[in-house]
């Protein structure tokens, strides 16, 4: 989602609160809970899950392995739920021609660097760069090259833009910032 006027362009980024992340966290939680319950029911020797008889699974080694997978899945699921609740990766890109500044803000993980805020002068921007990697896992990323610093990615890694969409976005941004486009 973006908002644009003659002198200001604001690009809002959704972060980790996406439907796919909610679905994966929920599916992983239910699956790992099922594995853990089967492992516990094989240890206790009674059915905690009614549609799956625990007598068919002996505790050593199947019950232990299923319990381990269940615990590992719960840890991964809790990690996903934490990134969703903290909304890691969300933020905005602000391009202000009137003031001559670019501000990039992202939310990170809790701690000292939770808020990631970068500010640059527009005159320090060398170019808008498109990096294309073709193959099985095709990847197209839009970068902003800044003098004296490394390139800053402007698109998310999971954002699968078509070549036409990434070119259009790069052309609009380069026109707005009045900088050239580079393709790698």
Swiss-Prot record:
Membrane-spanning parts: 22-42, 57-77
BP term (GO), one: photosynthesis
GO CC, one annotated term: photosystem I
Superkingdom of the organism of origin: Eukaryota
Localization of this protein: Plastid, Chloroplast thylakoid membrane
Membrane topology category: Multi-pass membrane protein
Keyword Endoplasmic reticulum: no
Keywords: Chloroplast, Membrane, Photosynthesis, Plastid, Thylakoid, Transmembrane, Transmembrane helix
InterPro entries cross-referenced by the UniProt entry: PSI_Ycf4_assembly
Purpose: Seems to be required for the assembly of the photosystem I complex.
Family from the record: Belongs to the Ycf4 family.
Protein name (record): Photosystem I assembly protein Ycf4
Annotated source species: Ipomoea purpurea
């Amino acid at each position: 989602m973006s908002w644009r006027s003659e002198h200001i362009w604001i690009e809002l980024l959704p972060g980790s609160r996406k439907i796919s992340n909610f679905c994966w966290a929920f599916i992983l939680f239910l699956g790992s809970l099922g594995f853990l319950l089967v492992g516990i029911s094989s240890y206790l020797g009674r059915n905690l899950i009614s549609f799956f008889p625990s007598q068919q699974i002996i505790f050593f080694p199947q019950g232990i392995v299923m319990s381990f997978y269940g615990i590992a899945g719960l840890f991964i699921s809790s990690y996903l739920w934490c990134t969703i609740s903290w909304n890691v990766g969300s933020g905005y890109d602000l391009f202000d021609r009137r003031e001559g500044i670019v501000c990039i803000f992202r939310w990170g993980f809790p701690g000292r660097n939770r808020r990631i805020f970068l500010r640059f002068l527009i005159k320090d921007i060398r170019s808008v760069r498109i990096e294309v990697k073709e193959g099985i896992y095709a990847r197209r990323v839009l970068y902003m090259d800044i003098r004296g610093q490394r390139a800053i990615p402007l698109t998310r890694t999971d954002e699968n833009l078509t070549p036409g969409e990434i070119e259009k976005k790069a052309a609009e941004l380069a026109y707005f910032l009045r900088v050239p486009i580079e393709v790698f």
